[in-house]
Amino acid sequence: MASPAFMRFLPRCGAAAAFGTLLGLAGCQSWLDDRYADSLPPTSGVQPIKGLAQNVSIRRNALGMPLIETGTFHDALFALGYVHASDRLSQMVSLRLLAQGRLAEMVGPGALEIDRFMRTVNLRQAAEIQYRNASPRLQRFFEVYARGVNAYLYRYRDKLPMDLAQSGYRPEYWKPEDSALVFALLNFGLAVNLQEEIASLTLAQKVGSDKLAWLTPTYPDENLPFDEAEKLKGLRLDGQVPGLAGVEGAARQVAALSMLGVAASNNWAIAPQRSRSGKSLMANDTHLPLSMPSVWNYVQIRSPKYQAAGVSIAGLPGVVAGFNGKLAWGMTMVLGDNQDLYLEQLRRQGNRLYYLADGKWQPTRERQETFFIKGQRPIREVIHETRHGPLLNSALGERKNILQPLPLKSGYGLAYRSIQQEADKTLDGFFDLSRAKTIEQAFDATREIRAMPLNIVFADEKHIGWQVTGRYPNRKEGRGLLPSPGWDGRYDWDGYADPILHPSDQDPQQGWLGTANHRTVQPGYGAQLSNSWYYPERAERIAQLAGASKSHDTQSMIRMQYDQTSLFVAKLQAMFDNPGMALPLRQAIDALPEAQRSRAREAYDRLMAFDGKLTASSSDAALYGAFLHESARQIFLDELGPEDGPAWKAFVETANLSYSAQADHLLGRDDSPFWDDTRTPQKEDKPAILARSLAAAVEFCEQRLGSERKAWQWGKLHTYEWQSDSSKMAPYLGAGERAGLGAIKGYLDRGPYPAGGDHTTLDVSAYGWGQDFDTWLIPAMRLIVDFGQSEPMIGVNSSGQSGNPASPHYADGIDAWLKGRYVSFPFQPQNLDRVYGNKRLTLTPAR
C-alpha cells in the first residue's frame, strides 16, 4: 500500500523499463536488488538485541519460513515481533495507517477519501475497547511483541525496504495497541453486508425499490426479500443521499486494498472413522484477494511452554490457524451480519446538524478529526454521529476541491451501526485456542471469541468439532439486509442473540464437518446470523467428497483443496433440461438468425455435455465461463448499465460478496422483470435471453480466442496476477509516481498465469461476473493436519514469505502454490534439521 516516489531513480532505471527491452528490464531489477540489499536482514550470524532474556535461534526453510526456538515464551513473542518486522515491515506500516485513517501521510491527497472513510468508521475506538478489556496477561504479550518489532525498527531504521524508503515516510515505533488496531481492521474486513447495503442504495436509485429484491436474493431455496425492500418504498432516494457515490467509492477502495468484504474460505475436519489411519484430519484454506505479499505468513514457534506452527499476520502476536502438536484448528467466515446502515433524515439549523429520531429532531454528536497529508497542509473536519453511529457520508461526497471540508446539509445521512463498541475477551480467546490441547479446551476458548463471526473447525487425534463465534444483533423488525429508516425505532436492535444459540457440533455421525461461507442453519433459526450467505456449491462439494470415502488421508485432502469441479454446471444443465424450459429454449434458438442459431446450438450441445471440471486447459470451461459472462450482461446490462456506471459496478461487486442475482436468475426466477430487454420493442422472456446468451458465448470465444475450438482454454481468459501493495495504490498517486511504478511493474508484480476454477469450486478463483475474468480471490494459504502422520502438518502460502522485492523469498512461494508443493512443519526434534537446516540467526541479549 505504500506510495514509492520512484521518480528519484527513474533516470537511471526507468527508461530501460519503459522501452521494455529484456536486457534493460533485467538490468533495472538487478540494480534495484543491489540498491536495497542492505534492507534484507541476515539469516545467519549473531545479533545482540536489548530486551531478550536468553538466546533465540531463527532458522528458515527453503521458502524462508521461520522456525523460532527460544527458552522462554517471553523471548518467543519478542522474536516473533522481530521476525514479522524483518519480513513484512511495509505491510505492517500500511495496515496500521489504513486502520488509523492516515494513509495520506505516506501516499498524499489521493488516499484522503480512504482516510475519511476509515476515520468515520473509527476503528481506533474498537481497538481501544478490545485492548482495554483484554486480560493483563494478554496485554503483556502485546507489549513484548511490540518491543520485538521496535528492536528491528531501531536497528534497521536507515535500511528500510524500497517502498518505505522511497516514500519518505518514517515509520513510527510499534505500540501494543497497534496490534489491536490491526485486529480491528481485519475484523472490519468481514463486514460483507456493509458493502451490500451501500450497493443496494445505488441499485435502488437506478431501478427503484420495487425491483430491488430481484437483485438481492439471499439463497437458492429462499423467497426474494420483498418484505425487506418494503422499508425503502416511497423514499425519494435519487439524489437525496449526499455523498453516496463517495461512500461507495471509498468502500470500493478499501476493498481493493484487501480489507473489506471478502467472502472467504473452506475448512473441514474428517473423523477417525473416515480416515485411512483411524485418526482425525483437518484442512483449511482461507480465501483472500490476490496480493503481493499475502496477508498470511507462516511461522513455527518452539518454546518450553508454547509450541505452534501455522499462519500468522504481521502485526499480531501468535498463530491464527494451525497446529500445536495436539490440536489443529482453522476458520472460515460466517458472513455474519452484525452491522446495519440506517438512513437518517437530516436538516441543518444554524451551525448544527439535526436528525429525526422517533418524531423529534436531535443534534448530531460532533467529532473533530485532523488529516495530515503528504505535500499539503493539514485539514480539520467534522464527523457527525447519530444514536445509531457515525454518518458515513458526513465526511465523504462531492466537493470542488478534495482538500475542502464537506458541509453536510439536508437529505439522508448514512449511519453505521456495528458491534465494535462491545467489550469482550476475544483477543484472549484466540490465544487460548492456540494453546488448547483437546476439543473440550478448544470449545471453551472459542466461546470467548465474540467480536469476530467465524466458523472455527478443530480436531485432535480422536475428535472433531465446529463452533460459530461472534455476536449477532436481535432486530426488532426487519432483517438488516438493506438499509433501514433510522427515524423509526421499530428497526433498532434489541440486544444480541444468546451465545447458546451459536451453532456448534462435535463428532457427528456422518464422520465429517465442513464450512464454506454457506448457510449453516435453516431459515427461521433462533439467531439471525446473516442474510448474505455465499453460493452453496463449495459446501456441497465438501459434503460430496468428504462423505464419499472412509480412507481419507493427506493426499485426499490435497486433492480436495485443489479440486476445480463446479457443481453449478450440473444445476445449469438441469435448468436447460427442465420440462418447462427444454422446448421453449429450443424454439428460441430456432428463432435466432442463422449465424446466431448455429452458435447457440453449438454452445448448448457442448454445455450439456460438459463435465464441470474448470481446468485451465479446458475448452468447454472457456465456453462455460463465456456463457456466464454473456448471460449476466444480456439479462441485466440494459437496465443497470452503462458498464462504467455506478449501478453496474455495484451489481458486479455484490456478486463477489454473496449469492447473486446472476446465479439466481439462471437457476430460476422465470417471472423476473429483468428478462425483458428494455432496448427492444418486443418483450423478451427467459428462453429468448438464454438463447441469445448461448450464441453470444461462442462469438465471445471466437473474438477473444480465435475460431479454432481446440485453441480455446479457460486459462487464456481466466488468469492470476499478483500485484504488490504499491501497485494497488497506483490509482491514488500522482501521474509521475504512477509512471515510476509502471516502469518497474515487472519487479514488483508477478503474472499473469493461467487459472482454473471459479467462485463455486473448492480451488476458488473468483472474478467479476459480467465484468472480466481477472482472478481477484484465491486460497491465500492452505494447511492440512493429518494425525495419522508422524509429522502431521503441511502447508503452502500464496506468495513469498517476504514483502521486500529485493528478497529471494518475495515471490518463490507462488510456484509452490500453483503446483501444490506443500511444506512440512515438523514437531519432532530429529526432523527439524531436515526441513530447516543448520544455518541460523542467533539473537543474544545485549549487555
Swiss-Prot record:
| Predominant place of localization | periplasm
Which EC class does it fall in? hydrolase
Keywords tagged on the record: Hydrolase, Periplasm, Quorum sensing, Signal, Zymogen
Q: Which GO terms describe its molecular function?
A: hydrolase activity, acting on carbon-nitrogen (but not peptide) bonds, in linear amides
Kindly state which reaction or reactions the protein catalyses.
an N-acyl-L-homoserine lactone + H2O = L-homoserine lactone + a carboxylate
What compartments host this protein?
Periplasm
Any signal peptide, and if so, which residues?
A: 1-26
Q: What is its EC number?
A: 3.5.1.97
Q: Record's GO cellular component, any one? A: periplasmic space
Instruction: Indicate the residues that form the catalytic site.
Output: S265
The stated induction of this gene product is: By long-chain acyl-HSLs, but not short-chain ones.
Regions annotated as coiled coil: none
Q: Name one GO biological process term.
A: quorum sensing
Q: Does the keyword Signal apply?
A: yes
SUPFAM superfamilies listed in its UniProt record: N-terminal nucleophile aminohydrolases (Ntn hydrolases)
Quaternary form? Heterodimer of an alpha subunit and a beta subunit processed from the same precursor.
State the function annotated in the UniProt record.
Catalyzes the deacylation of acyl-homoserine lactone (AHL or acyl-HSL), releasing homoserine lactone (HSL) and the corresponding fatty acid. Possesses a specificity for the degradation of long-chain acyl-HSLs (side chains of seven or more carbons in length). Appears to be the acyl-HSL acylase that underlies the ability of P.aeruginosa to degrade and utilize certain acyl-HSLs as growth nutrients, including one of its own quorum signals, 3-oxo-C12-HSL. Is thought to have a role in quorum quenching.
Additional facts recorded: AHL-mediated signaling mediates quorum sensing in many species of Proteobacteria, regulating hundreds of genes, including many that code for extracellular virulence factors.
Q: Which family does it belong to?
A: Belongs to the peptidase S45 family.
Name of the featured protein: Acyl-homoserine lactone acylase QuiP
Top-down, what is the taxonomic lineage of the species of origin?
Bacteria, Pseudomonadati, Pseudomonadota, Gammaproteobacteria, Pseudomonadales
